[in-house]
């Protein structure tokens, strides 16, 4: 499964809520502020050499572009629902695995590329490790190829 399926964008419920919150802030705070900045800059007179006006207009363009981007994401969002109660790894699964050679244990959640945040242990479904794990089950030993091949054992799959 990819992050975009039939023109839908796969997101966790949490990520969708974050995007909606950002959109609300952009519309209700940032957009209002930049409109005021433009009005203030216009009141200074000649716009041909008004740096504040140019900066405010550029900022407005960035804000409006981000608003359109977020609205598109929201309109195409499909919430990821892991296979509840299943031991099969899917997008949305939290997975604990052990490196067979080193014994090192890692735990992370497989999410869409939009949701991915390695600092929060959320990896993209496009990453090599996720690609190796998707469709596998708790207890399976899987070969992962990231620069070099190594084997991992799936210790636990949590689908909530």
From Swiss-Prot:
One of its GO terms (molecular function) is DNA binding. HAMAP family: GreA_GreB. NCBIfam families: greA, PRK00226.1-4. Necessary for efficient RNA polymerase transcription elongation past template-encoded arresting sites. The arresting sites in DNA have the property of trapping a certain fraction of elongating RNA polymerases that pass through, resulting in locked ternary complexes. Cleavage of the nascent transcript by cleavage factors such as GreA or GreB allows the resumption of elongation from the new 3'terminus. GreA releases sequences of 2 to 3 nucleotides. The lineage of its organism: Bacteria, Bacillati, Mycoplasmatota, Mycoplasmoidales, Metamycoplasmataceae. Residues 3-84 form a coiled coil. GO terms for biological process: DNA-templated transcription elongation; regulation of DNA-templated transcription elongation. PANTHER family: TRANSCRIPTION ELONGATION FACTOR GREA. It comes from Mesomycoplasma hyopneumoniae (strain 7448) (Mycoplasma hyopneumoniae). Belongs to the GreA/GreB family. Keywords: Coiled coil, DNA-binding, Transcription, Transcription regulation. The keyword DNA-binding applies. It comes from the Bacteria. This is Transcription elongation factor GreA. It holds the Pfam family GreA_GreB.
